[in-house]
Amino acid sequence: MVQSRKRFECFEWSKVNFNLRASKYDSVSEPQAELAHGLFDLSLDYLPNTPPVLLELGCGTGHLSFSLAGCFPKMLDCLDISKEMLQICGEKLRDFPSVKWRLFENDAEDFEPDTQYDAIYCSATVQWFKDLPAFLPNAKKWLKPGGIFALGAFGERTLQEMRTAYKEASGRPLSSEATFYSQKKLLSMFEKAGFSLESSAECIYSQGFENPTAALKTLNKMGVTGTGEKPLNRTEVLKLKEALLKTGNEDSAVNFSWELIAMIFRGD
């Protein structure tokens, strides 16, 4: 697999999906790792000078958690719906014996924290929320005065090649449990919840593969398994692979684009 960088169903279904793929997730989740690293770098100027109290929503296997622990926070709370992913995250955090950290197997939209935070981090997660606008006012209450919400999201141009190829192969739009928002839409939702934008960054990350089968297997290992309302038949699968080859270039036979959006919001 080749990568190149250009500039910077429901809750239970998702839980089972990510539990099954936890052990393979780190090996294929380069876009998620890139987004986490970019968000972390963007957020550093907005953290307090004293050791912060941090919350990470949808920590997964700990791409971002490891960097946050490296800040030696006063406390780091990490939350995810997947028990298996939390276990992998916990193994990484054990490299920081002096850091107090806690793991919560919980849906972010139902979480009830027992403390307030200097910063809430949420990277590569909001696409799975059932009702993001309803969640944001609650999250704002979890912040200390002057606290920040650091958001990393996949924009609406994410996986556009896959969606185009699927429509060409099947004649149907590709359905998905995930909702990809534009930066403008995210800004509108956060401002309506009382947040103010401090900083933002955006780029397209290109992920290349040696053949269509490798590309589709990688999406499956990531947990991106939407295949439309009915499965593709054999003929449609062959057409899908042929359509994906149209995305190739001199470096890779198949390419997927990921729109990476990082935004820092102030809670008051």
Language-model regions, residue ranges each:
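A short SAM/SAH-binding and catalytic strip from SAM-dependent methyltransferases
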Residues: A119-L132
